[in-house]
Regions:
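Short acidic-glycine-tyrosine-enriched beta hairpin
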Residues: 76-96
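Short histidine-centered beta-strand/loop micro-motifs
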Residues: 30-32, 51-57, 74, 83-84, ...
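A short, N-terminal "cap"/entry segment at the start of jelly-roll beta-barrel domains
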Residues: 1-40, 50-52, 141-146
Length: 146
């Protein structure tokens, strides 16, 4: 997923604010500290869409659903896909080393907190999980999700 628009502002105390408009229509409003800690408010577009599958080597991610619902997909090798539907007011924590992806339903809003040793090289693509998730329709997601 590429970024269409980016705007950045230095807030002080080694913290910067960043706005990104993603190719899938999501709007991301981020606060990032020089130590790698990170907060992001993500607003989905008018259509549901998958993000890009990935894993982190050292970062823990905490996703909280404010509005709507998301599907959390994880991968355990041998092409075993796990799907979980996360609804308003609920959250999920993703630990380092877990291949994962999110499907954001239309109009959903989530908050993401990242912490741990967050470096530019910590994000690693997971094409294996993309192959299992990107073609799933919203209907299939809701049928397979728990």
């Amino acid at each position: 997923m590429n970024r269409n628009k980016t705007m950045e502002l230095l807030l002080g105390d080694d913290v910067r604010a960043l706005y990104e408009q993603m190719d899938n229509g999501e709007s991301k409003y981020k606060m990032i500290a020089d130590d790698g800690s990170y907060y992001c408010r993500t607003a989905a577009s008018r259509e549901g869409a998958w993000q890009n599958s990935h894993l982190h080597l050292h970062v823990t991610e905490h996703y909280l659903v404010q509005t709507g619902w998301i599907a959390y997909a994880s991968y355990e090798g041998q092409s075993i896909l796990h799907l979980r539907i996360v609804t308003e007011g609920h959250h999920i924590v993703v630990h380092p080393g877990v291949h994962h992806n999110l499907y954001m339903s239309a109009g959903s809003v989530i908050h993401t907190i990242k912490y741990g040793m967050n470096t530019a090289s910590d994000w690693t693509a997971s094409p294996e999980l993309d192959r299992l998730t990107q073609s799933l329709s919203e209907y299939e997601i809701l049928q397979k999700g728990s």
